[in-house]
Amino acid sequence: AADYFMYTCYPADGDYLPSLYFGDSNIAANGEGVLKLLWTLGFQKTDMLWYLTQVRKNQAKESMPTDTPMGLLYTPDLSAAPMQPSLSLSVVYERMGWSMMRTSWEKNTTLLGVKCGHTWNHSHADAGSFILFHNGQQVIKDGGNCWYPNPWYREYFFHSQAHNVLLFNGQAQPQEQQYK
């Protein structure tokens, strides 16, 4: 679980630690609370300390800063944090259909996230969409995000055209869910 948060983050200069998201969260969402709880429960990897040093204070509602009771109790000693994690530069999460590739774990490098696999259940027709970070910026974003009651949700954001998906001969992915 901890590796997922590290692989989806984009170390960069700025006010928050950006993360990959495909219209289902927000760019500042992070796993700070999850990693601190895992650490406290004994699931400890030094790479987790690196991640915790990258998260900015109060960057998201999931945060657990040290000036709160939970943060004070669950924040590990970060002095042993490595300069960079020992994780590989790429990973594929086959079961969820996500892949991440990066040039380095240093700040402001390049990160490509690709969403692939089936479009089913609660998904959009966005298999094959991608997000690109480069030189500290999100260069290619996923445009498919709006509130469910908004009429544009079904009329536009649910469809391939709202995402970074390649169309073949002008054809997009089927709009119907594969599994209802």
Segments (PLM) and residue ranges:
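Active-site rim segments in enzyme catalytic domains, especially the processed small/beta chain
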Residues: 125-180
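Carbohydrate-active enzyme catalytic cores, enriched for enzymes
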Residues: 1-139
